[in-house]
Swiss-Prot record:
Family: Belongs to the universal ribosomal protein uS3 family.
Pfam families named among the record's database cross-references: Ribosomal_S3_C
Subunit structure: Part of the 30S ribosomal subunit.
Domain KH type-2: 43-118
NCBIfam families given in the database record: rpsC_bact
Ribonucleoprotein recorded as keyword: yes
Keyword list, A-Z: Chloroplast, Plastid, Ribonucleoprotein, Ribosomal protein, RNA-binding, rRNA-binding
Lineage: superkingdom: Eukaryota
Keyword NAD recorded: no
Protein name, per record: Small ribosomal subunit protein uS3c
Example of a GO biological process term: translation
CDD domains: KH-II_30S_S3
Lineage: Eukaryota, Viridiplantae, Streptophyta, Embryophyta, Tracheophyta
GO molecular function, one term: structural constituent of ribosome
């Protein structure tokens, strides 16, 4: 049987890069990893709590963390940075304080910067959030998938595959439905494929959304 590998891990070092850039002694590695997870969760929770965009999309593409001996540099890639840049110094300062409280890192400086994503709907995380918002508002899953594909087509992608699994439309038996538009060559290593797996809670239970976007071939 075919083994389904994560497309991002499969392409690390060729078309994908690590989102955490730091070195550590083997014994301290797990601590560093947990620290990264705390930073990411804290930022996502802050954005979720304080952001009210009509589409319900937070627009976090990914969060990059670079660590040196005395500095932690966090770069947030946002699709819709209006929320954080409106009251920029105040909002970012507040976010920094929140993250520092969570980490309890007194002897290290924390810098947070924001980078705008040119085509937000080229990023599967942003797209998954959009679909999740639609499903929570009880829009039919087929309609939500169709709309998501239309949004990516405007971003000049070469192909997209969307899969939603769970109790679709409140049916008793869980199933998976998927739709593909264009090419999605998962076995081609030089093909740059963005992927994300996202969980959404609806009134019928938990649904899993998976999105593969074929951006370009190198």
């Amino acid at each position: 049987m075919g083994q389904k590998i994560n497309p991002l891990g499969f392409r690390l070092g060729t078309t994908q890069d690590h989102y955490s850039l730091w070195f550590a002694q083997p014994k301290n590695f797990s601590e560093g990893l947990q620290e990264d997870q705390k930073i990411r969760n804290c930022i996502k929770n802050y954005v979720q709590k304080n952001m009210k965009i009509s589409s319900g999309v937070e627009g976090i593409g990914h969060i990059e963390i670079q660590k040196r001996i005395d500095v932690i540099q966090v770069i947030i890639y946002l699709g819709f940075p209006k929320f954080l840049t409106e009251g920029k110094p105040k909002r970012i300062k507040e976010l920094q304080i929140n993250v520092q409280k969570e980490l309890n890192c007194m002897n290290r400086k924390l810098n947070i910067s924001i980078t705008r994503i040119e085509n937000p709907y080229m990023h599967p995380n942003v797209l998954a959030e959009f679909i999740a918002g639609q499903l929570k508002n009880r829009v039919s899953f087929r309609k939500a998938m169709k709309k998501a594909i239309e949004l990516t087509e405007q971003s000049n992608t070469k192909g997209i595959q969307v899969q939603i699994a769970g109790r679709l439309d409140g049916k008793e038996i869980a199933r998976a439905e998927w739709v593909r538009e264009g090419r999605v060559p998962l076995q081609t290593l030089r093909a740059k494929i963005n992927y994300c797996s996202y969980t959404v809670r609806t009134i019928y239970g938990v649904l899993g959304i998976k999105i593969w976007i074929f951006v370009d071939e190198e």
